[in-house]
């Protein structure tokens, strides 16, 4: 097919005339004539050429025509009336000659450019996003803090239109929304009215956990803020006192609100008056016997579940109001049918139900403390606390402990254990003999009975040392609320110590008892080699740090082991060393055998009570004598004259040494008191404090 000459167009006289596209006709012609019509019509910028090409693929030809077809937008005035009849006849004859079908003059449709590919779109979007980010960064650099705050508020504040949209959505689904609210309210009421149910227990755990987390968060924030104040500055002391008091108030409120195991933890914190600031010990001391008490209907429910009848079935008189409320139970005064006055200890009805949740909360709190203060790592305490409390929640176990302790101390007239009434006792109810007396730390009440606090402290120390060093069956929770003082029934001018609450005891084997006796005796005598030997025998490798924890003084630098006071230099060295070696202390406590932890607890409580009584006795000398007595009691069992003679020799030498130390410190204290009276030494308060340091 020959190329048509463009001279045909010159015959058209109109300047703006454009030949209308033959696109459809050409496509049909090519489809009908695969071999004859070998031309391809191309239009470009008001020019069209017929190219001679071999067309073997119809689809390719169609695509080529679609791609090359183009009409310039500058020529939009192609009208059918602008074409002369002669021109129409010419093109129609041309169409017939080359089988181009009918010729129609229609208004041309504009062709659309090929849309960009997906990759190109992604690249364009990425470029736009990068440009937007760069613009935002440039704008944010120019913005002030007020502008940023204003932008945040604009994003967070709900506009009126958004509020209307929320109301509209609520109006559409108001039935479902109201039903959900009513269901939630009903679930809360059901949980409150039925605390023993599954939902009630879960709701109680969640609420108690929330209170504990809230309290812990506030305390950690307070101490974090305090840490930014220089310790040597004048304002640090004032801020620290305020921080201690606020934290103690928060803990007290948490313990009173949650009750149960939280009060138990608060009691232990209150006993650490030789370690913690006075704000803690003074604030939390009310938890020892002034915990919140429960309503009488809870007491009746426990009686009905455990014994089968109400209290009035077993007692002729039963006080509805408790005389004391402790961490795990409250005590009521009652009179049996036989006329005996008894104390009825009733466990809180929800204590066992909340036990697992409180232990879980305890674990979380220790984890948070470890995260906020990395030097503290006491997560291992949770499992030990759980094992101890499981035994303490069983009052039948407490009754067994009380009867065994009474048998061990039967030869000691200065100690008394109340008698247990088994018919009126169960796992959650314990009925014992009622004792009239005062708390051991109530100095005024002790003096009003005509007794001496020095004698009271000495009797108490001797009783506890007898349990530790001789019987190896130890009351490990002897805080002031569990120890009463009364006039001796046979000797009214002498005190008698009454031990209460025997739920937490620890029994030690004979090997441990002998090793601990040797350890304490050599601690007092400052025999380093033997202290190291018996510390390792007890399972403690770091014997120096262990000795410091027992004596609460720098053992390595102590010149005399019997001093009941501690110098300011020793105290400062002890505290600074404890702070620097806090991680070592944590590691030691973590690796220490668990039975030693309870001994340390007992030791701290003895120190605490001695301090509250004014440190009238030297507890080191008392404990050293009973340690030697415990060793002698073992040697007397063995048949051997040489062993007996050697033990007597050791006892005499120890007694001579103890008497010498006691006389030395007696004269030192007398001289100091005379200097104070003569006003030769002015800082009287400082001297007295040094004499009472660490009991």
Curated annotation (Swiss-Prot):
GO cellular component, as recorded: membrane
InterPro entries on file: ABC1_dom, ADCK1_dom, Kinase-like_dom_sf, Mito_struct-func_regulator
Coiled-coil spans in chain: 118-150
Keyword Coiled coil set for record: yes
Positions annotated to bind ATP: 323-331, 345
Topology of the protein relative to the lipid bilayer: Single-pass membrane protein
Keywords for this protein: ATP-binding, Coiled coil, Kinase, Membrane, Nucleotide-binding, Serine/threonine-protein kinase, Transferase, Transmembrane, Transmembrane helix
Pfam family, one: ABC1
GO molecular-function term, one example from the UniProt record: ATP binding
Active site feature: 477
Polar residues: compositionally biased ranges: 105-119
Compartment(s) of residence: Membrane
Biased segments, Low complexity type: 120-139
UniProt domain Protein kinase: residue ranges: 317-695
GO biological process: altruistic, chimeric sorocarp development
EC number(s) stated in the UniProt entry for this protein: 2.7.11.-
Disordered, as annotated region: 105-149
Transmembrane spans: 177-193
Family: Belongs to the protein kinase superfamily. ADCK protein kinase family.
Listed name of the protein: Probable serine/threonine-protein kinase abkD
Originating organism: Dictyostelium discoideum (Social amoeba)
């Amino acid at each position: 097919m020959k190329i048509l000459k463009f001279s045909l167009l010159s015959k058209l006289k109109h300047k703006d005339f454009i030949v209308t596209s033959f696109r459809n006709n050409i496509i049909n012609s090519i489809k009908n004539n695969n071999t004859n019509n070998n031309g391809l019509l191309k239009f470009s910028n008001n020019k069209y050429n017929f190219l001679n090409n071999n067309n073997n693929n119809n689809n390719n030809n169609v695509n080529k025509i679609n791609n090359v077809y183009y009409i310039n937008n500058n020529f939009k005035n192609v009208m059918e009336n602008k074409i002369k009849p002669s021109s129409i006849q010419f093109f129609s004859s041309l169409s017939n000659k080359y089988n181009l079908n009918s010729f129609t003059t229609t208004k041309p449709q504009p062709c659309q450019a090929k849309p960009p590919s997906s990759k190109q779109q992604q690249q364009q979007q990425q470029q736009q996003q990068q440009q937007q980010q760069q613009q935002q960064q440039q704008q944010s650099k120019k913005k002030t803090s007020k502008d940023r705050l204003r932008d945040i508020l604009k994003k967070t504040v709900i506009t009126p239109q958004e509020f209307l949209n929320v109301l509209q959505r609520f109006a559409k689904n108001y039935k479902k929304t109201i039903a959900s609210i009513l269901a939630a309210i009903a679930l809360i009421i059901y949980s409150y009215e039925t605390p023993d149910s599954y939902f009630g227990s879960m709701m109680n755990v969640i609420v108690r956990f929330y209170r504990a987390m809230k309290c812990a968060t506030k305390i950690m924030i307070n101490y974090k803020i305090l840490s930014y104040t220089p310790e040597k500055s004048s304002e640090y002391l004032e801020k620290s006192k305020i921080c201690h008091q606020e934290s103690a108030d928060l803990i007290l409120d948490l313990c009173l609100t949650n009750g149960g195991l939280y009060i138990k933890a608060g009691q232990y914190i209150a006993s650490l008056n030789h370690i913690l600031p006075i704000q803690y010990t003074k604030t939390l001391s009310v938890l020892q016997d002034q915990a919140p008490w429960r309503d009488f209907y809870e007491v009746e429910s426990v009686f009905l579940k455990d014994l089968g009848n109400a209290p009035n079935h077993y007692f002729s008189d039963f006080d509805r109001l408790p005389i004391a409320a402790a961490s795990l139970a409250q005590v009521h005064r009652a009179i049996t049918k036989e006329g005996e006055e008894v104390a009825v200890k009733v466990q809180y009805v929800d204590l066992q139900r909340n036990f697992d949740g409180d232990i879980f909360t305890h674990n979380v709190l220790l984890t948070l403390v470890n995260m906020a203060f990395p030097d503290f790592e006491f997560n291992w305490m949770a499992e030990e606390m759980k094992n101890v409390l499981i035994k303490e929640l069983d009052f039948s176990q407490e009754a067994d402990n009380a009867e065994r302790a009474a048998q061990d101390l039967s030869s000691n007239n200065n100690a008394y254990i109340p008698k247990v009434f088994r018919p009126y006792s169960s796992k959650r109810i314990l009925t014992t003999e009622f004792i009239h007396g005062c708390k051991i730390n109530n100095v005024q009440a002790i003096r009003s009975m005509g007794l001496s606090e020095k004698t009271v402290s000495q009797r108490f120390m001797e009783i506890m040392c007898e349990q530790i060093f001789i019987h190896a069956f130890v009351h490990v929770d002897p805080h002031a609320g569990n120890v009463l003082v009364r006039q001796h029934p046979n000797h009214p001018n002498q005190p008698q110590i009454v031990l209460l609450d025997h739920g937490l005891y620890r029994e030690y084997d004979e090997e441990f008892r002998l090793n601990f006796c040797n350890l304490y005796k050599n601690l007092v005598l400052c025999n380093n080699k033997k202290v190291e030997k018996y510390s390792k025998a007890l399972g403690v490798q770091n014997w120096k740090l262990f000795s410091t924890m027992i004596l609460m003084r720098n053992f390595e630098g102590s010149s005399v082991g019997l001093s009941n006071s501690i110098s300011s230099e020793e105290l400062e060295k002890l505290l600074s060393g404890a702070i620097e070696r806090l991680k070592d202390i944590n590691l030691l406590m973590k690796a220490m055998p668990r039975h030693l932890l309870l001994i340390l607890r007992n030791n701290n409580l003895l120190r605490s009570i001695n301090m509250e009584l004014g440190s009238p006795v030297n507890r080191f000398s008392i404990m050293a004598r009973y340690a030697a007595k415990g060793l002698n009691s073992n040697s007397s069992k063995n048949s051997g004259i040489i062993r007996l003679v050697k033990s007597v020799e050791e006892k005499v030498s120890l007694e001579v040494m103890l008497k010498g130390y006691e006389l030395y410190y007696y004269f030192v204290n007398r001289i100091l008191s005379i200097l104070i009276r003569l006003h030769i030494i002015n800082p009287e308060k400082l001297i007295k404090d040094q004499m009472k340091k660490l009991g």
